[in-house]
């Protein structure tokens, strides 16, 4: 249903945001930004 679709979208968006946050944090730590 539409709720499932929305849930999946939210999950995917959350994963993407978390991933980019982690990437940014690690590049800051290693001084590669």
UniProtKB/Swiss-Prot annotation:
Protein localization: Secreted
Tissue expression per record: Expressed by the skin glands.
GO CC annotations, alphabetized: extracellular region
Keywords: Amphibian defense peptide, Antibiotic, Antimicrobial, Cytolysis, Disulfide bond, Hemolysis, Secreted
Pfam family, one: Antimicrobial_2
Disulphide-bonded residues: 27-33
GO biological process terms held by the UniProt record: defense response to bacterium; killing of cells of another organism
Keyword presence, Ion transport: no
Family annotation (InterPro entries): Antimicrobial_frog_2
Biological role stated in the UniProt entry: Shows antibacterial activity against representative Gram-negative and Gram-positive bacterial species, and hemolytic activity.
Entry's family note: Belongs to the frog skin active peptide (FSAP) family. Brevinin subfamily.
Protein name: Brevinin-2Eg
Organism, as annotated: Pelophylax ridibundus
């Amino acid at each position: 249903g539409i709720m499932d679709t929305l849930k999946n979208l939210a999950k995917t968006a959350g994963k993407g945001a978390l991933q980019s946050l982690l990437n940014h944090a690690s590049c800051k730590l290693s001084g590669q930004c």
